[in-house]
From Swiss-Prot:
PANTHER family: GLUCOSE-REPRESSIBLE GENE PROTEIN-RELATED, REPRESSIBLE PROTEIN GRG1, PUTATIVE (AFU_ORTHOLOGUE AFUA_5G14210)-RELATED. The gene is grg-1. Transmembrane segments: none annotated. Residues 49-71 have a biased composition (Basic and acidic residues). Induction: Grg-1 message levels were found to increase within minutes following the onset of glucose deprivation and rise 50 fold during the first 90 minutes of derepression. Residues 19-71 are annotated as: Disordered. This is Glucose-repressible gene protein. It comes from Neurospora crassa (strain ATCC 24698 / 74-OR23-1A / CBS 708.71 / DSM 1257 / FGSC 987). Pfam families: Grg1 (PF11034).
Amino acid sequence: MDTLKNAANYVGDKVQGATATASKEANKDVAKDSNQGVGTRLNAAGDAISDKVSENKHDAKAEAHKQGATH
């Protein structure tokens, strides 16, 4: 039963990590866009950093769940 739970959690964390990656990339594009205002660019840069932290967190959790599902 734990193997099934770990597998489901692995999939969920991989999806959340991928979502954070997509958001990070979109925010990086906004931060680099010279047509945007300085405030918008700074907010996007901060959001990209937050997304990177979230991405790393979910990837680490997914790896832990993967290990739990295979052992």
